[in-house]
Amino acid sequence: YGGTGYLPNDRRHQFKFRGAYGFSENWAVGGTLVVQSGRPVNAFGVGNPFDGTNYHSNFICVANCTSDTPSERIYEASLRGAGGRLPWTYDFGANVSFFHSFGSADMRVKLAVYNLFNQERVTEVDDERETDIGFLNPSYRQGTGYQSPRYAQLTISVNF
């Protein structure tokens, strides 16, 4: 109950651009740009306004949280995405390829660099706003997932 709102992977905008250019018979360069809007951040609570049980919920205790009588506690619904959105992410990759034929075989050597500008933006956060009824989580909205760091891949293939 109360779990309406935006789902965790709701990215409103996503753009992907890819291109390559062969500047000679043996050489080509290429690039990829992926731009994504941030996903929603939830603000999950622990309490339950309907009875005294404690569990992961969509309700946050806002008053009388320390009362031993559950019916005296006052809760507010926390819709999915109530914690705002994460920042946009940008990922640019580049590659260079070399082609060579020998006999009846074709060889390709490709060096690709991913996340060329080494963006390290947060892609996931701690969505638990409360650790217990009325107790705020000190790590709420702290990063738990980040963009992959820059890395390179060398590929050699031979077709015969």
Give each language-model segment a name:
Residues 1-45:
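Gram-negative outer-membrane beta-barrel transporters
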Residues 1-6, 15, 79-83, 139-143:
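Extracellular loop and loop/strand-boundary signature of outer-membrane beta-barrel proteins
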Residues 26-73, 85-93, 97-160:
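C-terminal beta-signal and adjacent terminal beta-strands/loops
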